[in-house]
Amino acid sequence: LLSEVPADVDDDFFLEEEVTPRMFSFNSHVGACPRCDGLGELPGYHGETKCPDCGGERLKPGGRAVKISGLNISQFCRLNVCEARAELELWRLTRNERVIAEQPLREILTRLEFLESVGLDYLTLDQRSTTLSGGEAQRIRLASQIGSGLVGVMYVLDEPTIGLHPRDTDRLIRTLKRLRDLGNTIIVVEHDLEVIRQADHLLDVGPGAGHYGGMVVASGSPKQVEHKGSSITGKYLSGKKGIQIPEERRPVNSQRTIRVQGASQHNLKEVDVEFPLGVLTVVTGVSGSGKSSLVVDTLLRAAERRVSGKRVEVGTHREITGLEYVSQLMVIDHEPIGKTPRSNPATYSKVLDPIREVFAMMPESKARGFTKRRFSFNAAEGRCATCDGQGYHLIEMHFLSDVWIPCDACKGKRYNRETLAVTYRGQTIADVLGLEISQALELFEAQPRIRRILQTLQDVGLGYMKLGQAGHTFSGGEAQRIKLASELAKRSRGGTLYVLDEPTTGLHVDDVARLLKVLNRLVDEGSTVVVIEHNPEVIKTADWLVDLGPEGGVGGGRLLFSGTPEACAHCPDSHTGQFLAPLFGMAPGTVLSVPDSGAA
């Protein structure tokens, strides 16, 4: 578009050079600034610095000189989606210019409108892809397809609602239906009940996880699936099963809170907010409203600096008080528990330690002089010398994904022949690592220490998982639940602050119910749990709610409400409240006729 619309240029460059689209691309040698190769920044000892030649605009002088309505392409791309759409609507083009620009303008506006419709209006057009969440990146790719106008295409989306507030989920559903109505096929892998209810056809796979699943238990419309007794999803759709609103919420002690004052990291606008101790607090708000800036960049970093004594950079704020009540800090995220076969549920939960002790006490071990160390696949004495106890060999494929193949010597068992001669109730240490957690629970029913740890893994819904399953094969939700179970298995000391960022990502609603039981157990043991979440099933069970917004980006960053979920349902400015209201039998936006309970 810029290469085809006339512009006022001060120098004589364009008298000699033809204006082409590549002049406005920092990915092309024709347009990219030669000093920084189109990056806009130069590497330096103290980090990256703005390129002095292009001023961070990435382009050669010719590309920067062309302007429309006073903006060159780099300046235009600094606008967020909303601002860019408004700017385009202000452009005043002549009849000839409009003929030339009509098609590209239509495509630009279509894509911008879609990005806005799925809650990405707060993103700037030049935002780096490395800073985007998986859900944001997926919706941006979908925007490029919407603008293409293709028909007869099959689109496959894996949990497109990740990171989406219920308000934006509604928008996404409308967009997917729009794609369908153009003559395309949409296949979505999804756990969100609202998306499931809007499907034309539903395939429910199960009934359980791991080898307990893998079958199609129901197929048909959502209404038809509701009546399939074998479908857990159907039971939640019909209301036969559900996550209940607690009859009574934990009381908040105003004298025991972490108080954050003047938080202004990123788009936060001098936020003053309290996080009560000893309760389950959920932080809500549409995408980009400032939740991570408040909880992760400010609260979490400040707590980390106090607890660990490390020099941690904390988000901009005036003052934070109450951290003296926090003795431990734990972040439960979706990151893998390890990247090699050495990391597994047995090692991460530390249940392998007492299991090794049991094997060391067997008569065969005592006769051979074996100690607990003999049954560690990280120790040279007992492990397979060929694979060093990994059970697998790594084959690097360079341009393809690396491949792990079983060791020819031990056949994946990790240990040498002498170590495998020792058994407990007929099982070798390798056999134990090959057991599912539910099976291991039966095997070690007479061992209290082992049983307690295994029971917590079972309680979070991981009974199907093998004790020795490699950590790099877990989904994000599985990794998170292993971390939670490991925390639960520890002797309670209280005073721990747990921070979770969207823990329901990748979880079926039945798994969400299990997750909530675990979180509530942590709180009952004296800990404080702070969760960033969009899932209404989690939000409605919170003891305390902190809602930011009202929108994302520059339109957000304000504290809209803090208090109980019921009170939030009466807050007319809160998008979260509007979706909570029906759950409490209220009309959205109903004004509460009692004194203010924390709305800001």
Predicted regions and their residues:
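Conserved phosphate-binding elements of NTP-dependent enzyme cores
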Residues: 1-600
